[in-house]
């Protein structure tokens, strides 16, 4: 059976690069060539320098003149229960004027709307995360159809396909920790459960796409180990929907595929990780008119704050890092990506 761990934990383990699996800076640099070490260190140092300028200390009362939008956060997760208002205040002080909080199931989506009603800077996206698809009730679409009518619901999702936690993957991981059998061993029964899980995710994803096309809202997509199937479904709906693949974790070729279909890519703090070479190449090359930035808070804290909880106030760090990669000023990059987010989510 699929894991019964909380949906928010499943989401954290399946968004982009698992934080647990990110190698240490020193280890990877020791294995890199001198040229690679020099280039990587230079980029990260520049990003940190810009981040320090872009992110004023909490004691500073004035906020930045630039405006940024955190296009993907999970403010309803337990990590923010105790200090959400402080989190929002810090975000404002760093120039993050708006935050899109993303539902991962019906309960989470309802809570996202409650936050959007309570706080003017918060907007909601409602949907069923792929890792929740087989656990959500079968008639979830009828409630989603009602939730999307709320004036502060600006998108549908997170939805998509995630093959990183299929039963066979979990079984292989368990076997690899024992002395019995090979890590890729799995049974026919497991294959059947894989197919059932993939079918549930695909059906839910297509229902979200159809709903987005019907109501005219953008769609927020989570993708993990499922590019071919994700692109195939997107191609079917691309003339009718506008999508963003959030927490982008692939290279420039995949980014260009999305842009060619008329969609967007959103980068989280994983672009700053030492082993995210392909992601950085995508961030450098993709059209500036198709980029957005996010935190995916509370996960994927950008360098140099890796040991801290991620929160919307850290968006300037990711924005500054990508701006440095592209040879842009932070102000210019913020202006362009904010404009993209406003257009995508229908914000004024």
Language model feature labels by segment:
Residues 44-45, 49-51, 62-348:
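Mid-domain alpha/beta scaffold segments of enzyme catalytic cores
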Residues 18, 25, 38-41, 50-52, ...:
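Intrinsic-disorder-associated, low-complexity terminal segments enriched in Asp/Asn/His/Tyr and depleted
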